[in-house]
Amino acid sequence: MEQFDDARPRLEKQYEQVQYDPASGLSPEALRQEFDAECARHPGEPRILTRARLMRLICEKARIAPEKDNFFASKVDGGGLFLQLRRQWGQEMWKKEFDFQPDGWCSMTDLKEHACHYCVDTSHTCPDWEALLTLGFPGLKRRAEQGGDTPFHRAAAMVCEGAAILCERLGRASDNPALEALAHRPPQTLHEAFQIALLYHDLQEMEGEEVRTMGWFDRLYLNFYRNDIAAGRLTRESAKELIKYFWIAFYAKWQGKRFGKNFCFGPEINELSMLALETYYELNTVDPKLSLLLTPETPQAFLELVARNIRDGRTAIVSLNYPLVVEGLIRHGRTPEDARRCIPVGCYEPAVFGREISCSGATHFFLPQAVALFLEEKGEYATFEELKQACFHRIAREIAYMEEQQRRCESIWPEINPAPLLSSTLADCIRKGRDITEGGAEYNSTACVVSYLPEAVDSLAAIEYLVYQEKLCTLDELRAALAADWKGFETLQLFARNRAPKWGNNDPAADRLAVELTRFVAPLINEAPNRRGGRFFASLYGQMVVERGRLIGALPDGRNAGTPVAKNLDACISMDRNGITALMESVVKLDLANFPCGTCLDLMLHPSAVQGDDGITAIAALIRTFLAEGGSGLQFNIFDVETLRDAQRHPENYRNLQVRVCGWNVRFTDLPPEAQQTFIDQAGAIAG
């Protein structure tokens, strides 16, 4: 096989330049005709069987792409039929349940009136990779057949049978013995294990559920690696080549312009952990991204290798506090044994591996918008304490509304996107005879991302300071300033921005409000039932800061309408005035185990602060200190403001400049100017 460095330009474009063999199967048009005929032969059957028939039809008869110059083959031309079917059913069910058609899958219409967002979340899933690697497609088919004869069991067996047939077809077309073997048995080598994982990934995403974690890399593949080394099939260097061929496929699919493909490492660190982090450094790409489950016992050598990646611009890495993650999961209903088998799904949202469907992007609650809605009520309050309690009451009311709307979403999920392939990997689904959309997993959670805490805290702190402490304005005057987007109230805005307490500075007044607000909100979410026999599941971070900021009006903290909001648990943009230690001190005052679906802090460092070996040691020490003090998740950006400004002016010179955007990385030059400016402003603030 061609050396990776020579093949890389071609491999990076492999999903853009797919060459399907016309003679290998049916065109999308012919496939559609055959599917329509198949549906006509089975009128009125459960929709999960309809989707299973479509998967098997595609696997058996769709065109495929021979890939003789790649270690891995997985490309089959499904013709967009799954997406068409999901849209058809989605439009029907949304109209039936809600009497409106949403923009895509999600309803954003309630953000302004109810400070929330809800959706049918098919984008945050984790299959049981252990079952796939242990049983293979034939074994999963047998397990489904032995589990029962319900429509669900038949559908699960059908899709696994189709996947095995596709292995045979792709293997023959690509001269790939690994694929041909996988048609009949589970993987036995590292090459075969990577191959079945990639093919499964592509099939599940075609089915309609985004794979948001590829599992524990250094646990799932360790024995395959060790056996190949012992048998002489691989050397350390040839294993690196194989990993690069595998990982670059995930970059190639979206070109680094989506949310990143997550591979997890830890908490136990081994020789494959070290090899993979070395390979990641050499690969130097925005995707895949790495999630690290760290403990006080994490070896220093591993942590310094992580720090070297971060210091040198490979920042698509989040460090997670494994003991705290486990504590949060146990506190909120998982058994200790299950909690210890956690996996970050998506950005940094823990779930129980192989037993939980967490839907970690299902709902969002926008705290500062709720504060703004409360102010619009035009109530009068003699004390700040009275105002705060009334504001909390409005927040509770809107959270209850959001939860009820989400339960309605989940009631139609089985009729929109039943998931026989994903469900076939989960033993609990097979045991119960139920798809994931109907509560087939052991833990059926619905996450709520509690977003933009910094703006909410700073807004409440500003109200207390401006109205009740310094008496610089009345509530009605503050409302008038917000309605005018601070025009004509510029002096008051300066007091709000520069004198009122700010989150992220270890300020007791602001941090007290953050503790009170999070302590109030968490049980409203974590104790609420969902529609699938589980509960809601709180996380605490903020993403899409430019896009969501456009939808949020002026706020009491001095923020203008439509401007970007804070990422994750960071201070509001340019408001972290006391350095990173103060920022971390603010964060660790919160009881983050009450947000078991994940939280994260972003740190931006100037390159001069992390130069040389001492810089690597400093980053490693920051990670250890933050996690030891009770932080949950930590990630970094390291650059100076002049580099970013020059990249804006001369993007052709900075094609490999990565930035960490909430829970994933992108190339800086791929960001729109407004998003670029948020990084420039933050970098300018730390430069002084």
Labelled PLM ranges:
Residues 162-165, 169:
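Extended, non-transmembrane alpha-helical coiled-coils
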Residues 1-156, 166, 178-185, 189-688:
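Conserved catalytic cores of very large enzyme subunits
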